[in-house]
């Protein structure tokens, strides 16, 4: 089977590497252009490009997929299938129609749940205990194509979008290999999605990180897990942003009759009153302009006044 692979971030690298190890013939790897990075704004290659070049594969980095030169180059490869993993662009119809076995996407949720750009983050934010990956045939909609295979992965209490993404990338890589092998053998039939059951996972915005302390502590804890490494959950403290990188899983309602946002600093612990009588303990924080640190270290250098709040 001859493939074209489309992908960009680290999440896509395990799939590319396992397809190579499984001896699929990958004639072209398509990824985003290099982007400026760091203080010096030096161009940095996407992780998929780095992995592809290390494997001796041809790499193409078009800014657009509809210009004539790109259409001609991709069409010339005549792929049996195009594999898409977190590429970052919507494929045009000419490209969807090109391969005989279709364009096969790896999506980091159990479709039709969490269609969109941020399924890993939203599965955590919504408090899911199980998620997974889906291989699907791409159509002209947003993650609406027919499903090929699914595989579940439990969500652990200590998972963040970083750790969950790493786990899903490995599970998804194996699932893509299985999907392509079964398509090649002709024993895999795609099934339509149950569209009325669809939920969305839109791209995150910076303002999504702002914590509403009127919510129950469990909901806030889930947001903290899901919003790493960007935009990171934050609140306002003494006129500055205070990012909360990690917190302890809250206990059931503690019956605290205090105002949401009130800080409780005692015995080296930093806790915040939340909605419905609950309390959240922050474990790792970062005040604007300072480095990340354990909450205990923050309290060693910052005295919390009685009645002081975050907002």
Please report, for each region that a protein language model flagged, where it lies by residue:
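Short beta->alpha connector loops
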Residues: 8-11, 63-66, 87-90
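Conserved beta-strand segments of alpha/beta enzyme cores
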Residues: 25, 56-58, 102
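N-terminal glycine-/serine-/threonine-rich beta1-alpha1-beta2 phosphate-ribose binding loop
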Residues: 36-80
């Amino acid at each position: 089977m001859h493939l074209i692979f489309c992908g960009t971030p680290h999440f896509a690298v395990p799939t590319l590497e396992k397809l190579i190890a499984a001896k699929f013939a990958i004639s072209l790897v398509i990824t985003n252009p290099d982007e400026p990075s760091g203080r010096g704004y030096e161009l940095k290659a996407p992780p998929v490009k780095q992995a592809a070049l290390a494997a001796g594969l041809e790499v193409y980095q078009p800014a657009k997929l509809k210009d004539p030169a790109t259409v001609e180059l991709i069409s010339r490869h005549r792929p049996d299938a195009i594999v898409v993993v977190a590429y970052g662009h919507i494929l045009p119809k000419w490209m969807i129609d090109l391969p005989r076995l279709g364009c096969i996407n790896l999506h980091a949720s159990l479709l039709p749940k969490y269609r969109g750009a941020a399924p890993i983050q939203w599965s955590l934010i919504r408090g899911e205990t199980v998620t997974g990956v889906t291989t699907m045939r791409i159509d002209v909609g947003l993650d609406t194509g027919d499903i090929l295979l699914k595989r579940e992965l439990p969500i652990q209490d200590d998972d963040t979008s970083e750790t969950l993404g790493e786990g899903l990338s490995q599970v998804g890589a194996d699932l893509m290999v299985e999907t392509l092998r079964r398509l090649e053998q002709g024993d895999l039939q795609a099934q339509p999605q149950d569209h009325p059951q669809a939920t969305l996972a839109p791209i995150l915005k910076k303002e999504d990180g702002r914590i509403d302390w009127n919510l129950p502590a469990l909901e806030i804890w889930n947001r903290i897990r899901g919003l790493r490494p960007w935009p990171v959950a934050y609140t306002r403290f003494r006129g500055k942003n205070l990012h909360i990188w990690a917190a302890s899983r809250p206990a059931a309602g503690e019956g605290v009759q205090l105002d949401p946002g009130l800080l409780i600093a005692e015995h080296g612990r930093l806790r915040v009153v939340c909605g419905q009588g609950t309390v959240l303990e922050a474990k790792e924080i970062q005040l604007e302009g300072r480095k990340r640190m354990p909450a205990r270290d923050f309290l060693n250098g910052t005295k919390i006044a009685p009645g002081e709040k975050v907002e």
